Structures are given as structure tokens and as C-alpha cells.
Amino acid sequence: MEEPRRLGGRYELGPVLGRGGMAEVYHAHDTRLGRQVAVKTLRADLARDPSFQARFRREAQSAASLNHPAIVAVYDTGEDYIDNVSIPYIVMEYVDGSTLRELLHSGRKLLPERTLEMTIGILQALEYSHRAGIVHRDIKPANVMLTRNGQVKVMDFGIARAMGDSGMTMTQTAAVIGTAQYLSPEQAKGEQVDARSDLYSTGCLLYELLTVRPPFVGDSPVAVAYQHVREEPQAPSVFDPEITPEMDAIVLKALVKDPDYRYQSADEMRVDIEACLDGQPVGATAAMGAMAAGGYGAYPDDQPTTALRSDGGGGATTMLPPMNPDDGGYGYDERPDRRRQQPRKKNTSTIFLVLAGVLVLVGAILIGKYAFSGDGGPGNDKVPVPAFIGLSKADAQQQADNIDLVLTFKQQECEDQPKGNICAQDPKQGTDVDKESTVNLVVSTGAPKVAVPNVIDKNIDEAKKQLEDKGFEVETKQTESSQDEGTILSQNPDPGKELEKGSTVTLEVAKAEEKATVPDVVGRTCDEAKAQVESGGDLTAVCTDQPTNDPNQVGKVISTTPQSSTQVDPGSKVTIVVGKAVEKTKVPEVRGKTLAEARQILQQSGFTNVQVAQGSPGDDNAKVFASNPQPGSEVDDPAATPITLMTVPGDGGNGNGGNGNGGAIAGLPGFGD
């Protein structure tokens, strides 16, 4: 069994998935990562041509720089050698699905809504590539894959860009750079293209998905290209009544001849489609209404056009074989199992094919020269002056070179254009002049400089007015301050500095210091109250006990300091007062003690208000024989409770009261057992 061909020591090539004008695509296996991939190689018969080698490498560079889920990913690049000839290759994501061309050829009709959803995927890919500075230049059904789960994948980024710098032009409808049915007017006329050309091609593709026919058909590529330049397409709803006016408007705006009045970005077109799907108004409706009323989209019959011209930057024109209309299900030009089997042609047939191609090429150039000129005869020698204002000097020069105008430049200060941009032109935009005429342009050196006024301590409204009157832009940032709210605290740049009009001055504006509010937590527990006070992160809380005789206040918040609803600075501390049950104190036993001993015992228990009953001896040696309140009695506050002692002389006395066993003393209430 023959060993499979292996590239780079890891990519085993399987069956051919498709062949195109300059490359072959293989189903391959990545032995290192164990995954399926697609490998595109430069055709061996073209590999000896350095120009094709360079174009293929540029394709690899362009495609490898794009990483987006709606774009077929490039994993790796490399070179293989056959008979000492370098064969570059690109390793790509293998997509299991079919192309939109195969879907169209299947005869199945898509719902308009599904068509719009697929177009959104295409536009997301273009939006990403355009931001990366890459224009696809060949959006068509064969270059858009639909995976088995319905995801859109755009492929062959960079091919049209790489091949576009050769001298090739249209030979057959299916074998051109920018297929004729999806060609933008600027491509057909040989003019410079930008991202808006891709949007025109996307409009052609959307038209075909909706109606199952391209917007323009003809017997030859030149006839189709002529219609792209001169004819207006019919509304898609002419062919399918299910298509809404909003869908018509989106398609027709994408197909406007003048790029300036087409969609200006993939994002803008995608937003309109999403609005249409949501049942919302679309911007294209108003734009196309203006065209119908003879606005910007009207194309007068005598509008001059530019003759189709070839690019002189490449080598000799080379005929490429036409692509098979049935390109297979994998998005590479055709699958082997679906290709029509054709008999091998003899060398004579090849010679006739080359001669026929040369004749078609010459015819295309001649037809382009006459058919695309404004009056159908020799090219018009007058051209309208473009709008140079707002362009950079380099961009203005490029536009002038495209239509054979000569530019002169002078520099001066301009208030309405940044430095380096064109701020004035003579003649004005739209003036018809002879080719090789001179257009005088003024390049801005920047706006005149103005001293920044001092607005510190002024109110914001007054400060903004003063700065804006001088031509400055104003930005503000707020800072908490004790100064009045709206007062300017500082400015940047500093007062007196000279700046161009339109420069930005940043103002620091005072705003009121934020305050925290003490919440009402009375009646809560300590933990509940602390959590509520500290919940905002601006306050801290601490609990303290306070005795209370009210049993309902025990364990509950009685009050706070500061009081509830008080405005305080962030970070302030709130003291939470919690009720605590009062502890009872027993009156100690002091009977039989000397008066000095009794006082000491009572004071140690907190009874500081000790009195001697009237008529009782008050010397320290006197003996206590009774007290009021009686020993063992419980009181709330010993310091506030007076204790009255009855004493007898210290030398004794033989009454029972002297030894503590006496009864009550007559006439002294409260004394006794």
C-alpha cells in the first residue's frame, strides 16, 4: 500500500476536496494533534512562477491574521519540495458542511428570515476583517460555508487581494477575480476598492439567496459587469412576494452604484438586518426613499463613468481554467465525486482555449473603453473634482492620480480640520474640469492657538461657557469638597497655556461631601443593631450596657449616640446603648459589730450613706444592735440607699439588743426582727 504524502512531517494528505485557479485543497490528518484539517497547496504547474509563489504567501499572511468564529481558521503554513521546486501550503480548519453555492444549486428555497440570519454571519466576518485592513474582494456563494449546525464560515480571505495585483481581467463569468455576478461597479471599472465593495458583493449574494437568481445575468462577463455599472437591479420582491419592503430596502441600499451612498460598514448593514428581523424600522428604508425621490441615489444618464482598465503592475495575462459551477459541499471550488467527468483534451484544444481567452480579453478592454464611457463613445476628457476636504495629503494625492488630476498644496492654519488634513480646495467639489487640470489644496497646520482662561473658583456653568466661547472642548471630573457644589477646584492644562481650538480642557468640579445617616435601631438586639449600622460600610458601631428597671428594655437597644437620622461623616462611630437588668444588693449583717467595723463592712458592699440613729452613741467603739433596712434586705442601688444604725455604748449593756438578739426598740419603726 502506498504511503500517504506527508507535509511538514505531520500532515498526511487524503483525497482532493477541490481545485481552483491556483491551488488544490486536500482533506488531511494532523498526526501531531490528531485532528482533521484542510491543506491548500499551490498547483505544481504554477509553483515555478515566482509571482504565484508570492501571491500564495500573501494569501497565507492575510488569512493567518484573522481569528474569528465566522472565518475559516488558518492553523499553519509551510513549504514542500517536489523535484527541487518549493510548493507552499496552508493548513486550515476543516469545515464539515456545504457551500451556499451548493445550497442554491440544490433547489431548496430558504425562508427570507433564515437568509438574513446567514447574511449576518457573513457581515460579522467582514466587519472583523475590515477592521484588520483586509478586503475580501470575492464574496460569493462558493466562498461561504454553512456547517451542519448552521454556522456561517467565510473562507478564501486574501486570495482576491493576492491575485488582484496581476494583469488578469474577466475571461469567463466563473473564472474571474471577483466573479462577475458579484462584482462591484468599482471593480468592474478597474478602480480602487475598499470595504464597501465587499458590502456590494454581499448585497448580490443576499439578493440571490432571497430570489434564487443573481441581480444581473448576461451572456458574458462583460455584459454582466456592464449591468453592475449602468443598470439598476429590480427589487427582490418582484420575484418573491414574501420579501418585505424592509428587505428590499436593505438589498437595494447594498447595491447602490456609488460607494458613498452604499452601506459604509458591515456593522451598519448588520444592524439594519437585525432591526428587520426584530420587526423594527430599518435605516435603509429612508435612504432608498430619498433615492426614489431623486436624491443622492439618482444616476443621471449623462453621468460620466470610468473606462475599464487593466492593472499594469503585473506580468503577462494568464488564462485560468473556469471554475465548475458545482463546487461541491465543502466550500473549496469543487468536490471530486461531484465533478463532471470530462474527456482529456489534446494540446490543440488548449491552444484554441488560450487564443479564445486572448480574444475575449481584448474584447473586454475595448468594450470597457467604449461601453463604460459616459456617452457610449470615446472616453470623456472631463472629470468631476472629488471632495478632497477632510482627506490626508496622501489620500488626496491618490484620488487625484486615479482620475489624472494635478494637485498643488499650501499650508495654513484651519479651525475646522486637524493638522495634516485638507481644509480647502479650488475648484470646489463636483466642478467638471479637464484631465491634467490643477486643483489647489490647502493643508491644515492645525487650528490657531488660544490661551486657556483661568476658571478656577468659578461656577461650572460659567467656566464651561467661557472655555467653549474660546473654542475649547470641556471635560469634567467631580471631587468631594467642602467648597460649594459646582465650584471649579482645578483645571488642566493650567491657565495661560496656549492650545489649538478644539483642544480639551479638563475641569475638577466640587461636589458635596457625602454623609452617612444613623439608622433607627431602638428595640433591636445589639447584634442586629450593629449589623444594620455597619451595613452601608460607612459607619462603625459599638454596644454598651445601661441598667434599667424596665424588664421590656432588658437586652434591647434603648438609644444611640448620635441619635437616629443624624447626618454624620463616613467612618464615624455610633454608640449603641443596650438595657441591662439592675442587680440587687443585700444589706450585710453588722449587728454586734463596733460602729467602726459596721461602717467598713457596709461601705465595702456599696452602702456609703451610713447614719447613726438619733440618741445612739456615735463613737467608733459603740456596738451596733440594729439596722434599717434590716440585714438581708435587697436594694437596687446601695449607694443611694441610706443605712441607719442603732448603737449602745461600747462598754456593753446587758440588754439582748446588745448581743444582736434583742427585739425591736419601742418607738423606732423599722428596727426589730
UniProtKB/Swiss-Prot annotation:
One of its GO terms (molecular function) is ATP binding. It comes from the Bacteria. Its EC number is 2.7.11.1. It catalyses: L-seryl-[protein] + ATP = O-phospho-L-seryl-[protein] + ADP + H(+); L-threonyl-[protein] + ATP = O-phospho-L-threonyl-[protein] + ADP + H(+). Residues 479-493 have a biased composition (Polar residues). PROSITE patterns: PASTA (PS51178), PROTEIN_KINASE_ATP (PS00107), PROTEIN_KINASE_DOM (PS50011), PROTEIN_KINASE_ST (PS00108). ATP binds at residues 17-25, 40. Residues 302-345, 472-500, 613-641, 653-673 are annotated as: Disordered. It is an enzyme of class 2 (transferase). InterPro entries: Kinase-like_dom_sf, PASTA_dom, Prot_kinase_dom, Protein_kinase_ATP_BS, Ser/Thr_kinase_AS. Pfam families: PASTA (PF03793), Pkinase (PF00069). SMART domains: PASTA (SM00740), S_TKc (SM00220). The active site is at 138 (proton acceptor). Residues 11-277 form the Protein kinase domain. Residues 379-445, 446-511, 512-580, 581-649 form the PASTA domain. Keywords: ATP-binding, Kinase, Nucleotide-binding, Repeat, Serine/threonine-protein kinase, Transferase. Belongs to the protein kinase superfamily. Ser/Thr protein kinase family. This is Probable serine/threonine-protein kinase SCO3848. It comes from Streptomyces coelicolor (strain ATCC BAA-471 / A3(2) / M145).
